[in-house]
Amino acid sequence: QEFVRMNQTQINETKSKKWCKRLPLLAAFLIPLLISVIICIDHEVYPFGERCLLQVDMYHQYCPFFTEFVDKLRSGESLMYSWTIGLGADFVSLFAYYLASPLNWFILLCPKGYVIEFMSILMILRISLCGLTFAYYLKKHFHTNHPAIAVFGTAYALSAFMAAYAWNVMWTDCLVLAPLIILGVEQLVKEKKAALYYVTLATAILSNYYISIMICIFLVLYFLILLLEQREGKIGACVRFAWYSLLAGGTGAVLLIPEAIILGESGSQGISFPSAVEWYFNLIAELGRQCIFVETYTGRDHWPNIY
């Protein structure tokens, strides 16, 4: 009996240690979630009031697109074309930009008439997942399970960019995946492991090609920094990075190619870069916007939102 009690004690201690190791990651998910819920309560967002989180394009565009999407999924209609857009239009381009996120398929669980509420929940979920993935990156990158990773995960999830753009629900998947992609490229270079990099980058490209373009630009710059740190195997690292980046892009091509063809036939085909370089804003004033306690810019001069 004494032996059994000792074994049980060891098992309980092991479980306790495993639970403690998970606490920072769990906190990185739950703290942004709790703060988001408190904000909803304070602003009387349903079910705590009669308001909703939908604003601007989220209300006038994204919600109708989501409604069309769930109707197609439940009725078995084709995702290639829609008869509810004007006199009829392709649905592929809308799906590729607005609806391709894997999380959006959970809308099948949403009762009819609650699409707005589903989108609000999805927004909060993505904010919370940002905290989790960034904390996970810090844990693996610095080989630590310090509680501080939950703090920095929360800071990432509730950053100024998320505060300003969380309502653009089709963008935030890439923000969730970005820390995992960065961890993946580190593993690709340092450990010759490609699975995480390929899967996360391909998923990001499929989810939203617009933000993925910015992620890819960052990846090239970050890869060059990692390459400088490598003392050997640089050629192999370059080959792996190029190959798996192209492979991820090729995976995303199932949506990128139709999207490019459709955009080429739309009014966007005549758009080109300016022939001359010109400053449209004060650079010092723009840099000043990065400081704390400055007045939030709400004008319509279309200054670049740099974070």
Question: Language-model segments: which ranges?
Answer:
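Transmembrane helix-loop junctions in multipass membrane proteins, especially transporters and channels
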Residues: 44-49, 112, 191, 227-234, ...
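Active-site lumenal/periplasmic loops and adjacent helix-entry segments of GT-C-fold
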Residues: 42-142, 147-179, 203, 207, ...
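Alpha-helical transmembrane segments and their immediate interhelical/interface regions
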Residues: 17-29, 46-53, 206-242, 289-306
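Periplasmic/ER-lumenal interhelical loops and adjacent helix-loop junctions
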Residues: 56, 60-71, 96, 102, ...
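Short intrinsically disordered, low-complexity coil segments enriched in acidic
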Residues: 1-5, 208, 288
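Start-transfer (signal-anchor) and selected internal transmembrane alpha helices
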Residues: 1-45, 240
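Membrane-embedded helix bundles of polyisoprenyl
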Residues: 32, 36, 123-141, 147-228, ...
